[in-house]
């Protein structure tokens, strides 16, 4: 079984990649999602564990389906 922190780090790196592909700064993305920039930073660094509700907000902010947030290895 994978280490939870490892999965959080992988998810965060993937989210950061998706955000960059969308051409959004961390601050612009956080504003678009209605979240604090430091919270988004924590998710991207793998130190915050977002809820399902926040995952949905992140997907909407990136204008992607929520399942695309989990397409990382």
Predicted regions and their residues:
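Short C-terminal boundary/hinge segments that cap the last helix of small helical domains
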Residues: 63-73
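Short alpha-helical DNA-recognition segment
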Residues: 23-42
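Residues within the helices of the helix-turn-helix
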Residues: 16, 27, 56
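Hydrophobic micro-packing sites on short alpha-helices
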Residues: 55-59, 69-70
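Residue-level signal for the short linker/turn that defines the boundary of a DNA-recognition helix
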Residues: 13, 23-24, 50-53
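A short, Lys/Arg-rich alpha-helix, primarily the initiator
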Residues: 1-21
